Amino acid sequence: MAVISMKQLLEAGVHFGHQTRRWNPKMKQYIFTERNGIYIIDLQKTVKLIDAAYNYMKDEAAKGAVVLFVGTKKQAQDSIEEEATRAGQYYVNHRWLGGTLTNWETIQTRIKRLKSLKKMATDGTFDVLPKKEVSLLKKSQDKLERFLGGIEDMPKLPDVMFIVDPRKEQIAVHEAQKLNIPIVAMVDTNTDPDEIDVVIPSNDDAIRAVRLITSKMADAIVEGRQGEDQVDEKTFEGQKSEAAEGDKKTADNSMEDIVNAVEGDNK
């Protein structure tokens, strides 16, 4: 059984790519057709590639891999933080600071500063300092927390990265490439897939699509580390019945029929 059924992908709008004038020709192999000036992603391929990504992430997690989730666009911020945390991993969901990976030692000094400020806030140090100084220190703490809070406890450089919209996260992609860190990513029709090790062709702008796929990558990590029985039950709620229903329906329908059926609800 597929990790995510065709029905679930359709309901989340995973199949909607970008306008045809904003495409990367290298994504042609993942595009099914064009509708009203918008590319439609071939979900039959997406289903298989999600399975491949899930198995890859699960296998890496079983080896104890450190995984960094990256998604700084508004549609991804909440899902990236929530799912990385649920999987016991790390995340960057606001601006990517240049050198986060390639200048790791310097980033560590900023993380130490963040931890120091947190300690000052809890041990009473702020209570004895002038209000103006405390205000400045709190602003510094908030800024560091915003950009580095998700990697504050990351023990080392990541072994794998999961990225939502690698086109937007170009700096992160290039840093990972320099350090030979494998990338699993949601890749839309306007993105170069050659930069990604494990491609998931997908709409990367819809909140539901981002949450659906990000949650499955988190599930893979949980399963790889703890065993299938330990995966949070809520993540699989209704999945088996939906998948069975979805597979049965899609077995008798072409991709074009499916696109036509849902197009009215998603446009």
Curated annotation (Swiss-Prot):
Q: Name one GO cellular component term.
A: cytosolic small ribosomal subunit
Q: What pairs make up the disulfide bonds? A: none
Q: Which InterPro entries match?
A: Ribosomal_uS2 (IPR001865), Ribosomal_uS2_bac/mit/plastid (IPR005706), Ribosomal_uS2_CS (IPR018130), Ribosomal_uS2_flav_dom_sf (IPR023591)
Q: Does the keyword Ribosomal protein apply?
A: yes
Q: Which GO terms describe its biological process?
A: translation
* UniProt-recorded Gene Ontology molecular function terms: structural constituent of ribosome
Q: Which PROSITE patterns match?
A: RIBOSOMAL_S2_1, RIBOSOMAL_S2_2
Please give the superkingdom of this protein's source.
Bacteria
Q: Which family does it belong to?
A: Belongs to the universal ribosomal protein uS2 family.
Q: Sorted alphabetically, which Pfam families does this protein's record hold?
A: Ribosomal_S2
Identification of the protein by name? Small ribosomal subunit protein uS2
Which keywords accompany this UniProt record? Ribonucleoprotein, Ribosomal protein
- Return the Basic and acidic residues bias intervals: 225-251
Taxonomic lineage of this organism?
Bacteria, Bacillati, Bacillota, Bacilli, Lactobacillales
| Chain positions covered by the region annotation Disordered | 224-267
